[in-house]
Amino acid sequence: MPKPINVRVTTMDAELEFAIQPNTTGKQLFDQVVKTVGLREVWFFGLQYVDSKGYSTWLKLNKKVTQQDVKKENPLQFKFRAKFFPEDVSEELIQEITQRLFFLQVKEAILNDEIYCPPETAVLLASYAVQAKYGDYNKEIHKPGYLANDRLLPQRVLEQHKLTKEQWEERIQNWHEEHRGMLREDSMMEYLKIAQDLEMYGVNYFEIKNKKGTELWLGVDALGLNIYEHDDKLTPKIGFPWSEIRNISFNDKKFVIKPIDKKAPDFVFYAPRLRINKRILALCMGNHELYMRRRKPDTIEVQQMKAQAREEKHQKQLERAQLENEKKKREIAEKEKERIEREKEELMERLRQIEEQTVKAQKELEEQTRKALELEQERQRAKEEAERLDRERRAAEEAKSAIAKQAADQMKNQEQLAAELAEFTAKIALLEEAKKKKEEEATEWQHKAFAAQEDLEKTKEELKTVMSAPPPPPPPPVIPPTENEHDEQDENSAEASAELSSEGVMNHRSEEERVTETQKNERVKKQLQALSSELAQARDETKKTQNDVLHAENVKAGRDKYKTLRQIRQGNTKQRIDEFEAM
């Protein structure tokens, strides 16, 4: 029994370990990996390894693993990575697992600066990555510093700007708050939709020379072949869509591309090593096949996958809506509870105030009763005094009469009697005046007593009203709203060729009509422009890279990925090949 071989496969978010037999093929290992991770969109992916010479290479699926130049380690090391990239992520990436693997791979490439990303776009992408990781922003949970341990921006961007970690976090958080309600998988898709508009996204670069010996870059991607000057990987100068290419072949280091246009000459370039030509051929075949497949009706399998993905997404949206509904109900219930508690406190306070008013009113009533009693006593005294004075007046009158009588009877003592009469007359006048004064006082006291009695009756009535009044009604309750394998060829083979068929394909070059994601969204476009201006104030100009300079020139000239694509494909194939030869 042959001894099994240990294999470790690292995906973007997991490490898988297998034991394989010495006769296990690359396809058998690949199938085991995709089955383990639950992936059905296998045509984008491959297994990458480092060979004995230190070069990164794709595992050939039609050969045994042991017959390939995998670096001898225990276990054997492989990376499960996207080998081919879609033209439009939102149209082509169906399964959530596929979307997540692409998201993680592209994010890593941007953070490592393998894909150039301008600073303001890096902040926007970081906010989608944060939404994908943390969900909706919640200030109760996401306290300042919640992003301190996350790697969210390329080191280049951090070093170029005089901003603290807190200032970067604030800018990312502002956008994170705007993504409220966005599902995590939708956040990954939004990230990819922005990232796919970056010039270096999905491009495999190879060093080549034309017949003149000029050092250039060949870019192989989902849309075709592009030629770049050696100091500019952002802006291709000449482009050939896959629909213009009939045959690709190489002989040793010479690579020949035959256009569909029979009048056009062959497109010839030279690679520094044979293995580079093998890899270019494999990538051309794979990308061309996917380019043509996209321009034909979906297979039954893809239709089924899309239907299943739609159903799963719909189910998730329903579940999320249900969760949101329950959350809202909880929030409404909590608010109702708070309202009731608040009303209870308000009623208790009102009751306390009523009790205080009652005690105060009782005290006032007692005081007014006391005053009324005093006034009554004063009135009584004044009345008695008036009666006494009246009695004295009558007695004086009687005495006057008696004296007058005596005076009449006793004329002989007239002087004495006259004096006594005058005395009594004066006394009577004084008594009359005193009586009148006392009567006025009695009248005044009587008025005061009546007023006090009225105050007493009014206070009794108010107390009665306060004691009998019902508590204020509560406010009305709130009613809630309701690979096909593309062999890089045997290492000993110094030549290979592949015919690229374009039969049955409609609308070959639809990609030339595309616009970037930010051009579609005016609000995001303005926010990016504002952030770009803001970051420019904090930028250290001495730390600008060549790509920063090139990007700034493109922005100034109004160029983007798709405008450049249309421009570099202008003219016929012959004109573009002549242009390439002249570089």
Curated annotation (Swiss-Prot):
Keywords from the named record: Actin capping, Actin-binding, Cell membrane, Cell projection, Cytoplasm, Cytoskeleton, Membrane, Phosphoprotein
Gene Ontology CC annotation, any one: cytosol
Biased composition (Low complexity): 494-503
Positions of post-translational Phosphothreonine modification: 564
Residue stretches of biased makeup (Basic and acidic residues): 376-400, 437-447, 455-464, 506-525, 537-555
GO BP, sorted A to Z: apical protein localization; barbed-end actin filament capping; cellular response to platelet-derived growth factor stimulus; cellular response to thyroid hormone stimulus; establishment of endothelial barrier; establishment of protein localization; establishment of protein localization to plasma membrane; microvillus assembly
Pfam families named in the record: ERM_C (PF00769), ERM_helical (PF20492), FERM_C (PF09380), FERM_M (PF00373), FERM_N (PF09379)
Membrane topology: Peripheral membrane protein
Signal peptide coordinates: none
Domain FERM: 5-295
Biased segments, Pro residues type: 469-480
Post-translational modification: Phosphorylated by tyrosine-protein kinases. Phosphorylation by ROCK2 suppresses the head-to-tail association of the N-terminal and C-terminal halves resulting in an opened conformation which is capable of actin and membrane-binding.
Region entry Disordered, spans: 310-333, 376-407, 437-530, 536-555
Compartments it resides in: Cell membrane; Cytoplasm, Cytoskeleton; Cleavage furrow; Cell projection, Microvillus
One function term, GO molecular function aspect: actin binding
Amino acids binding a 1,2-diacyl-sn-glycero-3-phospho-(1D-myo-inositol): 60-63, 278
Functional note: Probably plays a crucial role in the binding of the barbed end of actin filaments to the plasma membrane.
Domain writeup: The N-terminal domain interacts with the C-terminal domain of LAYN. An interdomain interaction between its N-terminal and C-terminal domains inhibits its ability to bind LAYN. In the presence of acidic phospholipids, the interdomain interaction is inhibited and this enhances binding to LAYN.
Protein name: Radixin
The species this protein was found in: Mus musculus (Mouse)
Lineage of producing organism: Eukaryota, Metazoa, Chordata, Craniata, Vertebrata
Gene: Rdx
